[in-house]
Amino acid sequence: MKLENKKGYLYLEDGTFIEGYSFGAKGIKVGEVVFTTSMNGYVESLTDPSYKGQILIITHPLVGNYGVPEKKYEQGILTNFESERIQVEGLIVAEHTYPSKWNSALTLDEWLKSENVPGVFDVDTRMIVKKIRTYGTMMGIIASELEIDDPRKYLEKKYDEIDFTQFTSPKSPIFHPNTGDMIVVVDCGIKHGILYGLYKRGFSIVRVPCSFSASKIIEYNPKGIVFSNGPGNPNLLENQIKTFSELVEYKIPILGICLGHQIATLALGGKIKKMKFGHRAINKPVIESNSNKCYISTHNHGYGIISKNDIPPNTKIWFYNPDDYTIEGLIHEKLPIITTQFHPEARPGPWDTTWVFDKFRTMVTGK
């Protein structure tokens, strides 16, 4: 389907120029070009704050066929979106189509337009993904209806050099009251699926900006602390790493997820490195070291613990990926700290590892 036959373009920093057709909003956006192999869940993926600053390629050839539903909330938590708005800078797909589903409120094209996000379709996504898989992620420009004379001037600032949590973290605390123990979520750009997983286990939740100091967090007298997912390079987050290090002294149970896992690793003395093209999919295997069980899990990260030699002292490997042997979770041997690089809440994806939230609840409540 060629919407109005308007041209759209993707420029890659290696000089590759790709021409397709434009849909969504008009304009120019810059970002790191990454891909997900997820076959569904584009609503959740596009609203995942971990994608802030990135242009997303969806490898599944047909996108948009079930449309975009209306937002649904429970206690201020979205139950079918991962944040209030689209987070990606742009979207690249092979084919875009109109929806046929009973609960569709908008087409994908209408949704992108309403949130000022450009898209390009009718391009060879397989070729682009093979290039990224071979040479690694790279910066790119997505543009509609116009060609860019000098793309290099748009690509001077690299993704790794920007703290994107400044765009995804809340500006002030947000409360989600419940009947259970109070926990603090250090919100670097949390997926609402994580919030919902915690809320359904009875926790009263206060989300605080990720710039909050340890002393401010302790003022809430939390029984547990969660460091959330979020976008960007964790090695830039000196304040958050310092905050985690100081919170460790209180011996309060801590759960780190995705970026939170990376912050924990750095705060405890480990190393986080850039991956060649990352893990972005809803069918990634992880093996739990204690039981040797394999779980299928949802991933969205471009940084990680690449080798077992990079784990912090006094921690042991909780999960690892059998495809590339990157480390997918840690347990501290002396402190009540657990982390997962993957997303136990899924959304989208399988629910194999939602029990991680139950383990954290046991750490907090003692039962």
From Swiss-Prot:
Transmembrane regions: none
Annotated spans, CPSase: 1-182
A GO term for molecular function: ATP binding
Pathway(s) of this molecule: Amino-acid biosynthesis; L-arginine biosynthesis; carbamoyl phosphate from bicarbonate: step 1/1; Pyrimidine metabolism; UMP biosynthesis via de novo pathway; (S)-dihydroorotate from bicarbonate: step 1/3
A cellular component term, taken from the record's GO annotations: carbamoyl-phosphate synthase complex
Active site: C258 (nucleophile), H343, E345
Keywords in alphabetical order: Amino-acid biosynthesis, Arginine biosynthesis, ATP-binding, Glutamine amidotransferase, Ligase, Nucleotide-binding, Pyrimidine biosynthesis
Glutamine amidotransferase type-1 domain segment(s): 182-367
Catalytic activity line of the entry: hydrogencarbonate + L-glutamine + 2 ATP + H2O = carbamoyl phosphate + L-glutamate + 2 ADP + phosphate + 2 H(+)
Gene3D superfamilies according to UniProt: 3.40.50.880, Carbamoyl-phosphate synthase small subunit, N-terminal domain
EC number: 6.3.5.5
InterPro entries: Anth_synth/Amidotransfase (IPR050472), CarbamoylP_synth_ssu (IPR006274), CarbamoylP_synth_ssu_N (IPR002474), CarbP_synth_ssu_N_sf (IPR036480), Class_I_gatase-like (IPR029062), CPSase_GATase1 (IPR035686), GATASE (IPR017926)
Keyword ATP-binding recorded: yes
Biological process according to GO: 'de novo' pyrimidine nucleobase biosynthetic process; 'de novo' UMP biosynthetic process; glutamine metabolic process; L-arginine biosynthetic process
Residues binding L-glutamine, per UniProt: S50, G230, G232, L259, Q262, N300, G302, Y303
Pfam families the record matches: CPSase_sm_chain, GATase
Task performed by this protein: Small subunit of the glutamine-dependent carbamoyl phosphate synthetase (CPSase). CPSase catalyzes the formation of carbamoyl phosphate from the ammonia moiety of glutamine, carbonate, and phosphate donated by ATP, constituting the first step of 2 biosynthetic pathways, one leading to arginine and/or urea and the other to pyrimidine nucleotides. The small subunit (glutamine amidotransferase) binds and cleaves glutamine to supply the large subunit with the substrate ammonia.
Protein family membership: Belongs to the CarA family.
Assembly with partners or alone: Composed of two chains; the small (or glutamine) chain promotes the hydrolysis of glutamine to ammonia, which is used by the large (or ammonia) chain to synthesize carbamoyl phosphate. Tetramer of heterodimers (alpha,beta)4.
Protein name in UniProt: Carbamoyl phosphate synthase small chain
The gene coding this protein: carA
